[in-house]
Each structure stands twice: as structure tokens, then as C-alpha cells.
Amino acid sequence: MLELTKMNNINNNFKQELIDNGYNEIIVNLLVNRGYDEETICTLLSTGYSEELPIYNDLTNVQIGADIIESHIANGSRIYIYGDYDSDGVNSTYILGDAINNAIYYSNSSAQLSLKVPERCEGYGLNMSWCQSIVANKTTDTLVITVDNGIAQDQEVAYLLDNGIDVLITDHHTPNGHIPANVWIIDAFHNNDNENNKGLCGAGVAFKLAMNLLDRFQCVPNIDELYYKYIVHVAIATITDSMPMTIDNIKYVYNGIQLLKDGYGSEAVTYYRDYNSNTDLTPKDIAFGLGPQINACGRMNNTALALNYLFSDNEDVEDLYNEVVVTNDERKAKTKSSIEQAEKMLDIESPSIVLELDGIEGIAGIIASNLSSKYNKCTIIFSKDMSGKYLIGSARNDGRVDLLNILRSINNNSVVKVGGHSAACGITIKASRIKSFIKELNEILSSLPKEEVEEVVDTKIVVDDYISISDINKDNCESLKDLYFFTESNPVFALTDVTITKTKASNNNKNNMMFSITDNDNNKFEFWSWGIGEQYRALGEPKNVTFIGEIEYKFGKPSFNILNIVPMEMISIC
């Protein structure tokens, strides 16, 4: 028997007061039950919060960072920006790169700017071989700026400093405590800034630095236009990096989406909007559209394409966007074929799934997540590094054990490094030790107490709220559509105890189905849902069910996107 329950289900005076004052009950329940504080909830429910644009001078060391860049521009230095291969890293590089380019151009400086976004196969963060090439080719004063990385690359930073190169670190990750003392750092965690700044993505940090820099270059025209443009890119990065919805991030995402609707942003993102004929964008369009498309470039070792796309102009934006779409399609196809290949290789009797696959560096985590979820096993997908001496892997937990601690306990003759958390880790091992590694991992898993490795069975389904057919209406669709802060996870509802009176499968895809339903109040509703037909038929086509899913618009009218179907005889509603 499955137990259906609401998330937290908090009842307090503040919640009731909001409902009594006429605020949408479903929205109020979502905000309170998800644990947002009263200040954040009031901000979100306020009709005027969209006009409150983010400030950019409140981040520790951001003005010093702007002074450093200004000085190097004035001196005609060589400036490098070193980014990251994901959407946040590429957007961070775009924002700061565009601002510095404008400052150099309009101040008639002889400074030169170069952008470096590594391919995934080069690894995350400052790369020592790249640092060595910068030192070897140094002919003038040089500044290296990291965006969305750098706070954990202590050896690389020290090497640059020791060789006379200035370094400015901008990051939003947790420091490792070993960065040299004589380097300027803009990182809210390193500097113990406020919670709003700790919630920034890399692009948010880059934005604050970029705007402080442009304040020093009033020769740059239309700085307000650049401000609006950059907020769009901060919104994209905030959504795709699944950042916490602090008050500042709410402002970035809400205003960024609104500004994109109004035509702001780079040529690349406004082209994306127009190409998809979507002037009513929501964060979901970014999270499942443009975000994965940009990320696909990094996953397929073509990060330069993502950067070129963001910097594109009217003449080449169409061709570059088409390349990005093709790259994402290739990523999807490669993921599908790699999962199929992996399933042919795995030993179903083994306590774990540990496989080495070729050419899957950027999608190893997706493959590992898929197999771990499907087979309820700790899963690690490896691929060889460029030297062939090491295997770099993505590890995913099946929910039964603390995978990080297990991997840390394995003999260091095999493991080179491991990091992450209990559910998802990155690990590097010596290629020659793969068999020993698998043997030791399986021995550890097999030796754990039975209660720690009992088969995972989902016994509880947690939703944001219970709804009825009458709740699937225009008002709720509009209210939910406007909740741009739900980028971390979309609201999930239980449409409880409905009777299916009619079904119809799509002629083109039997997995897409139309449902006609009714409830105990004799409300009737008809809607289509994608990718659910196989599950429905596997359940024996039950008639009395609870649908788990999302309220949304489909075909221009209120609808329900089914994520799961549970026959009523299999569920207990709390």
C-alpha cells in the first residue's frame, strides 16, 4: 500500500491570514509548506515586486575587483576570462566578457581580452596546462579572471601568482581553504556574505562585477540597456543551475523572463524566443529548452559553440542556433544508445553497476542516474581521461547507502580523488585498478547490514497539495505560471479519487493518451498527457485512480500533466 501525503502540511495563523486576505489558496499552501519565510512569501505575493530590480554593489570585494580590471584595461594588459562548460559558466563568461569588451572599445584601450571555456574532457576549473601556456606566452601585464570556478584550484592559482600573473577569482562554490592569501576573491561563501549573495549563481556574481566595472566607464553608451541584457542571462543561469530561490534570485528570474519577453538579452536568446514563437516564456521553457541546449554543447565537448552562439549577431545567429539544436539532438541520441549499450553489459546479479564506456564524458551522470533509478543499485559510469591512465566517473546512489563515504573508504591505491555527496559523486581511479576497485566496492556493499541494503520500495508519495478537477482552471494556471521561483522543482499535485470514463491513444504515439475523467462531485474533465500510456496499460487500465502531476496550460487551455498513476486500491491518502 502506498501512502500519499502532503509536503509538511503546515497550518499557522500567517497562512490563514493570507488566504483570508484573498490570496490564491493553492499558491499560499505551496509557499508556506515549502518553508519560505514570511518576508519571502510577502515579496512573492506582492504585485509590485517585479519592479524591484536587483542591486549590484553589495557583494564583498566586487568594487575592488572592478578596480583591478579597470587598472588592467588602462594599462593595456592582456586579460583572460576562464569559465566553465555548463550553462552557468558560459553565461558568466558572456556577461563579464561583453562588459570588458565594451569598456576596452569605448575607452580606446589597447588591452586585449581572450575567453577560455574548457571542454568537459579538460576537466572542471583552471587547468594547469592552460596556466602553463599563459605563463610561457606572457609578454605584458596579464590578468586572469575566473568565473563560476577558481575557488578550489589552489595549485593553479598559486602557479599563476608565482609567475607574475594577477588573478581575480569570481565564484559561487564553497572554498577548499587552500587558496593563496594574496589573491582577490569574490565569492560569498569565502567572504561569508549574506544569504542572498550566497544564493547567487556564477552569472549572478559576474553580473555584479560587470556592472560595477561599467560604472567606471561612463564612456560606454546605453549602460542601462546592458544592465537589462545581463539580467536576462543571469535568469537563464539561475534557472539552469537550479539555484535556491532567495529574494534576489526571485528578482533575477522574474525580471529576466519579463525582459526577455520585451526583447532584451543577447541576439542569441532573443532569437531563441522568436524561433520558438514564444513571447509568453516561463522558467520551464528555459529549464527544458534553452538551458539543456546550451548544456549539450559542453556535454558533447563543443563548448566553443555555446560561447560563439551567445556572442553571435544577426548575421550568424540562425546558423549557430541550428548547430546548437543539432548538438542537443545528438546528445539525446547518444544518451539513449549509451544506456542501451550499458544495459547489455551490466551484471544484474552484481551488488553494483560499474561500467566503462567510450566517449560518454559529458553524459556519464545522465546514464548513471538512469541505471541507478531503474535497477536500484549504486551505479558508476567511467570513461578514460585523455592520457588513458585514469578513469573519470559519475556515481549515483540508489537510495540505500551513503555512496560518498563508501567510495572514500576504498583503498587509495585505486582511488585518486572523489567528491560530491551521498547521492551523487564524481570519482577518478587508476585505469589499471578497475577490477580491484569493483571487487572492493562490491565487498563493501555485500557486507553492509541487511537493513541498510534492503530493496528500495517507494512506500510514500509526497505532493505539494491535493486538488480536485475544479482546481484545474485558468486562475490557478496563471498563478502557477507566474511563480518563477519554482525552478528548483515544479509544484506537484495529487488529483485524487477520479474515475476514468474514456481513454484514447494518439495515432502517432501510443504512449500519449487522452483521458476523460469525472469526480465525486460530478465534475468532468478531458485532457491529453504525454508519455504515460505504457504505464497505464501496465497497470491494467484501472478506472478509479489518483493522478500525480502538474497543473499547466496545454493547447491554450488548462490541463494536467501526469507524472504517475496510482490505482485507488493501492493508495492510502493521509
Describe each PLM feature range:
Residues 555-574:
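OB-fold/S1-family single-stranded nucleic acid-binding modules
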Residues 86-89, 121-123, 146-153, 196, ...:
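Acidic, metal-coordinating catalytic cores used for nucleic-acid/nucleotide bond scission
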Residues 132-133, 137, 141-203, 207-216:
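Active-site cavity-forming subdomains of large catalytic enzyme subunits
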Residues 2, 7-8, 12-143, 162-165, ...:
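Hydrophobic helix-and-loop "lid/oligomerization" segment in the mid-to-C-terminal part
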Residues 532-548:
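Short nucleic-acid-contacting surface segments enriched for D/E, G, S/T with interspersed K/R
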Residues 513-515, 545-547, 560:
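Hydrophobic residues positioned within well-ordered beta-strands of beta-sheet architectures
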Residues 262, 266-267, 444-535:
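A contiguous loop/helix-start segment that scaffolds small-molecule binding in enzyme catalytic cores
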